[in-house]
Amino acid sequence: NEFSSRPSAANDIWGHVDLNTGDEYALIGLRNGVAVVNVTDPENPSEVGTISGLSSSWRDIKVYQYFDSGIGAWQAYAYATIDSSTDYVTIINLNQLPNSVSLVEKNRVVTKAHNVYITNVDHTLNIALPGLTPSLQLIGSNRFSGAFHSYSLKSPETLTAISNNYFGSGYTHDGASMNITDSRKDSQCNTSGDSCTVFIDFNEKEMKLWNITDTSDTKLLGTGEYDDVAKSNQYVHSGWGTEDKQHIFLHDEFDEKDAGLNSTVRIFSIADLTNPTQVGQWTGPTRAIDHNGFVRGNRYYMSNYERGLTVLDITDPANPVDVGFFDTYTPSNNAGFNGAWGTYPYLPSGNILVSDIGSGLYILKDRTHESSQGKLGFSNRAINANQGETLTINVQRDSASNPTEAVSVNYQLLPGSAKENTDYTPVSGTLNWPANDTADKTIEIDIAADATGEEFKEKFFVRLSQPSNTATLGSNSYLTIDVAGRVNSGTLAFTSAETTVAENQGSIDITLARQGSSIGAVSASYLLSSGTATVGDDVESASGTVEWADGDASEKTISIDIINDTDD
């Protein structure tokens, strides 16, 4: 009842951090649309707005964010699919946050689709991975018998089909991806570039791995199956890969309901991409159906329907251990389609989002990463850097009550408005702590000098991953590097390049917009000049100044008086 649209149920969920402000948002699918909720203050979430849609039990949502150098600001769009109703692909403009959201279009490349996915992005920031081009996959749609197919996000306000974009064989229910950079890219993907993009196709009765590095020339790599339950009792539903890209966790939506199993997650090794092989299995304490899951560090966050959220320790991926759960559906733990539909564990704050079919949005604090070997992370979520300096970043081994094991964590830089090899020198690697060592470890990054003195403030990011030996990722596993520079106050422009007015209309209002940043007070002067219409004869002379205060991003108007004369 707290949602403005008064939905009767909820479904899937995704998250978004606005890199202009650092504010965090939940995007939750509802029976009658998609709601965007500000969760920056997790104890006081507030709905920003809802984009309405036709009634459906199934919606899926993903977000793409990128830096627009033309306006000096981050831009973001959400893409929502719907199944069972003809409501197309809903594209949502997130660029008026925190004040509002708006509908860009109902894109008609398909009439409906069960799921949507975006490859080659970081799932916390929803930005492109270094050196890779994101593409959007529509999954389980009314086209191509439901097989997944891809679209370009070069113009993110719409979906542009990629040539030969029909991939797969048979209906794809859900998908995930990973980028392979080790020897498998050469020996198994036969890819000449730096990485191989593997799409994981959950295909109802099997899991298929596809090489989609060239999205117009997709090739099947291998197929994974299992036989502990009859095919008639299987539904290969969804899954996710580990951060080391060696294992996939697979969810079957029917084996609890139809084969009488307790919650069962199967683990496949993909050491050989051409032959995925089951190497482990997690069996839960209840009959609740496992639905969707996501990896963060050595934790697996799983929406477990009537059990709510289940969290597994996957330090040993083949032998997961149940380390926590939060019950969003208290009446029972049966094999029914009630309770937690989706989860999103990637917010920079470390908070976890859960969507429950009957009770809505949950924002949870993660208490499952406590470990005697410590939590590995940054002390803050952001730090400042100067042009031309060598920046030293400390990484902590915190809360280690009995640090008897050697532990490690990997690090990688992600470009933002600051670009690698232009604004900073990219580095990556592994930080190591010997047994009983809790001293900070350091990462050094060379920041390029500003030769002109004209560069704007910029930012890029450091990401931690793959903690070892039961050490976990702390809440601050992402660090924003804010590089000093000139303040970007946005750009000023007319909202339209031209407009038409009747001579007898009397006057016309011309609208100006402040795009991008709203930091600082800005102004623009204007003056009319003659064209085919003459100032003084056809239009009254006008000049002046339009002003915006610090933080003001509202549209402004200039009123121009038209002279109604008798001349042609």
Walk through the language-model features, giving the residues of each.
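Feature marking well-ordered beta-strand scaffolds used for ligand recognition
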Residues: N1-G374
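Short boundary segments that mark the start of a structured unit
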Residues: T368-D568
